[in-house]
From Swiss-Prot:
Name of one Pfam family that matches: MGS
Statement: the UniProt record of this protein carries the keyword Hydrolase: yes
GO molecular function, one term: IMP cyclohydrolase activity
Assigned protein family: Belongs to the PurH family.
Keyword terms, alphabetized: Hydrolase, Multifunctional enzyme, Purine biosynthesis, Transferase
GO biological process, any: 'de novo' IMP biosynthetic process
GO cellular component, one term: cytosol
Gene: purH
EC number: 2.1.2.3, 3.5.4.10
Name this protein carries in UniProt: Bifunctional purine biosynthesis protein PurH
Domain MGS-like: 1-149
Amino acid sequence: MSERQPIRRALVSVYDKSGLDQLAKALIDAQVEVVSTGSTAKELASHGVTVTEVSEITGFPECLDGRVKTLHPKVHAGILADRRLTSHREQLTALEVKPFDLVVCNLYPFAETVAQGGDFDECIEKIDIGGPSMVRAAAKNHANVAVLTNPDQYEDLARALSEGGYTMEERRVLAARAFAHTAAYDVAVATWFGSRDGVAVDGVPTFVGTTGELSHPLRYGENSHQAAAVYRSSGEPGLAGARQLHGKAMSYNNYVDTNSARRAAFDFEAPCVAVIKHSNPCGIATGSDIAEAHRKAHACDSLSAFGGVIATNRPVSVEMAEQVAEIFTEVVVAPGYEDGAVEILSRKKNIRLLECPAPHLAGWELRQIDGGLLAMETDLFQADGDDPANWTLAAGDPVDDVTLADLSFAWRACRSVRSNAILLAHDGASVGVGMGQVNRVDSCRLAVERAGDRAAGSVAASDAFFPFADGPQVLIDAHIAAIVEPGGSIRDDQTIEVCRTAGVPLYFTGTRHFFH
């Protein structure tokens, strides 16, 4: 390992002041000269650090409500000077600039301000200028300067100081993290700015981007010959930061299915369980409690549920845990677990138990294509047609409240099924799912086949319109009680006619929920 770079002088300017007591102790113990700014200097001084204010170095006061603090040649020359070069050392001497060996800086909470609903001016004020400049300068000059951007690095700083400083390899790792930090920050600003009124074009952002920091490598990807890893985005921890309570390490496919399952379960306000396999529902159900919801979801297709992923929108109860313990399950993900539930589930050595709060779905979804990205607003049931009060009765008589509730359930559950999607439901539970077929009539046949005798009296939802009347006829022949679909086909009159003739109520939503 390369020779260590001693740390004799540090520049510290942080917004997030957590861990400053730990940082202060490390700097004091190593007798590091500290230069700092404003409130950071005061906080460090309160922990016993002898601090030199930046304004004493620059001869220029902080100004413009703190907008200008460190943007000065005597600061940046001290960060950027490559002391391996004689000419740089000579210029530092001539300019009376002392170099920095360490820069500790984290940035204004821009993304957090946006997430909290800050107005335009508040968000603008939280765009950091001096901080990213210092961080990038130190990262560029990592041959001479170490840079820290997160309080979680302070403990390792104490270790490095005790060993005589960071090695070149360690400084390079710190620099990479620093550049990732500023890159994510800039992407957040550009994405927000690109969606503002007067900047967006026809309501579409002029810039979209996403960043990810390596969380951990995975054993392999979708298949064993593909490398894979999990990357965490800034903000809410989400599934990528879920707490694993038990079981083997998550696989790539586990993550994909778990992500689909969580979204399906949290599409409902009532206690809900979604059982997912290959990103498609084996069953989705609501119940009076989470154990009942699980029984109903599992009953939809107990054969396919073998080796599936289970997601809940409520903590897993002991009763539900006892039920799941009898089934081979890859993953259970929930916002929590009642006392005793984890112990029951842990009887199965390999089952993966994750604790994760409700998903925070981004306003826009991105999908990579050759040469670019596709971006669209996330489907959050925000359309008028997702409210049954706005549905149009196209055929038959109005249904009673119980049947309407089942139609509403089926409509929401159907969104989680890969297109072409048909979902049959009864009593707040799916009883037959037809997914992923390239024609809609085959999806109808598959849903009816999966439901068996349960098809009679159930209701049906279709994620898109019926192009022909053959699909509805399959459902009618299975004695479906009512159908809900978007409508909009040039042959809607044929679908309306077969439903009218059979006396089957048909509702049009005017909204589609394709899912590819």
